[in-house]
Structures are given as structure tokens and as C-alpha cells.
Amino acid sequence: MNDRVKVAIIGPGNIGTDLMIKIMRNGRHLKMGAMVGVDPNSEGLARAARMDVATTAEGIDGLLRLDVFKEIDIVFDATSAGAHGRHNELLQAHGVQVIDLTPAAIGPYVIPSINLEEENATNMNMVTCGGQATIPIVAAVSRIAKVHYAEIVASISSRSAGPGTRANIDEFTETTRAAIEKLGGAERGKAIIVLNPAEPPLIMRDTVFVLSENAEPAAIEASIAEMVSSVQEYVPGYRLKQSVQFDAVPPDMPLNVPGIGPRHGLKTSVFLEVEGAAHYLPSYAGNLDIMTSAALACGDMMARRRMAAGIARGFKETAR
């Protein structure tokens, strides 16, 4: 009996190509069915074709016309927030589940270390690379104390940022901010992304500042360490860059949080780095690795559930 379902990727850029290679190397319940783009000269489409994956340069409409489409159960959308709405509408009409790697956020936010097992929507949003790296830390603090405010700064190599990432900077900050509050548990959130032009390229680095109610620093540090271990299960290159730092914010010197006013308590500062697995781009592109690794974990879970429920579209066609 076959234990894999076929998937397609829309968007043969940096993220889409890295995800394709991950699926082919590490996917437990996934099998590449198609790679979809809009540029016939795309390097990603050419690479997919060399790896015997069906391709089309006619976008979502081309995917629907491919013979293999009737066997596709899951589609990963690695295009743009603007294009995702139409893609999702057409795919949902065919009973295909969608994993959204854009900041469109039509479906619920999913971060594997926080809520992977709880979600089973037909469209799941992978937040952003910065969100995948930093929101688990905010959630770790939230497990111990109420978080008034969380601010994250994601610094990625300019070389690792393709046209899709650059076109979605505004959506990146808004989606990440919303997920800091929704999944991280912060009363207010803020997200900043920095495209670092340094040469040689630096690996992804993230800074997380959290202002919470007073709590025992040791308990927060232990919660963060546990969360880091959870993320490392699917992103081995994820790690703390240095020890967690704590600063008291006394009642007579509160910090003013926009939208909610002055707050005091405990400030927690966490410094992270994410080294990529170098499946496609070099190891400095940890921002790609954490996003595609999270999407792979989500896809494997979707596939298991579809097969267990007997609703996999391509199951009969691909069964051995």
C-alpha cells in the first residue's frame, strides 16, 4: 500500500525550489507531482523537469490542465499574497488542501512547535520566515507569564530574498505582527525585517524582545529552552546565539506600549540564529530553511490525515 500523496508547488523560486528538494529527500508521506510557474525560462522549473517532476509555465490554470492534477492532494503556494486568493479559490473547488507560504493568511496561522496538531483547516498559513523563527519564543514566555508586548527583528541575507519576499515586505510585517498576538499570546506585537547586504552573506539572525508580567526568570529560561528543542526537531540549525537576558522594568519607570499604555514587569531578550540545511541555497539562507521545513511538517501531517480518513484524491492512482 502506498504511504505517500502527491503534491504540487506553485512558485519555482528560492522557497519553492528548496521545498521541492526537501519533499524529495525528507518527505515521509509526500511525493512531488508538479512544479508550477509563469516563466518558461525559470531555473526552478528547469530543475524540476530535470528531476522528472511535471511542470507548467502557465500558472494555476496550467496546473489544472495537467494530467497529474487529478492525483494532487496538497498544493504549496510559494508565490505572493496578491496571487494566493485566486489560487486558493480554484484549488478548494477541487477538494485540494492548500499550504500558504505567502503572507496572505486566508487560513489559520500554523507554527509546528506551537499548534500543528491542533489545526486541520483546508488552508493553512505558514506565517513568515521571521514569524516561524521568533513567535515560538514569544509563546514560550506566554506559557509562564502574561505578555504585554513582543517585538521581533528578523535579519536575513539580501541574497536569500527573492522577488517574492521583496514584493511582500509590507505583508510580512503585518502578518508577523498579527501572528505574534494570535499564536504568541502577546497583547501587542511588532515585527521588523532587515535585508542585510553584507558580503559574505550572514546567516539568519533574529532578536526577540518581550515585556511580560513579573515571573521567575529561571522558569522563562527553561520554557524557552524547551521550545528551542521543539523547533530543532524540524529545523536542526535553529539555536540560541547567547544566553537569555532579563531586565526588570519597575513600576515607577514603565515602558509605554503603543495602543495599551504604560506597562512594567520583566523584559526578556532572546537572540537567535538559524542556519539552513543548504538543500538549495547555501547555509546562510536559514530564513528559507525554517519556512520550508515548517511547510514540510505541515504537509506530512495533512497527508497522514487524508490517508487515514480515506479521502486522498490520488490514493487509488498511486497505490501499489
Swiss-Prot record:
Protein EC: 1.2.1.10
Active-site positions on this chain: C129
GO molecular-function term, one example from the UniProt record: acetaldehyde dehydrogenase (acetylating) activity
Keyword Oxidoreductase belongs to the record: yes
An individual GO BP term: catabolic process
Top-level taxon of origin: Bacteria
Binding residue positions for NAD(+): S160, A161, G162, P163, G164, T165, R166, A167, N168, N287
Catalytic reaction(s) noted: acetaldehyde + NAD(+) + CoA = acetyl-CoA + NADH + H(+)
InterPro entries: Acetaldehyde_dehydrogenase, Acetylaldehyde_DH_C, NAD(P)-bd_dom_sf, Semialdehyde_DH_NAD-bd
SUPFAM superfamilies with a match to the protein in the record: Glyceraldehyde-3-phosphate dehydrogenase-like, C-terminal domain (SSF55347), NAD(P)-binding Rossmann-fold domains (SSF51735)
Protein family (similarity comment): Belongs to the acetaldehyde dehydrogenase family.
Protein name in UniProt: Acetaldehyde dehydrogenase 2
Naturally occurring in which organism (per UniProt): Burkholderia cenocepacia (strain ATCC BAA-245 / DSM 16553 / LMG 16656 / NCTC 13227 / J2315 / CF5610) (Burkholderia cepacia (strain J2315))
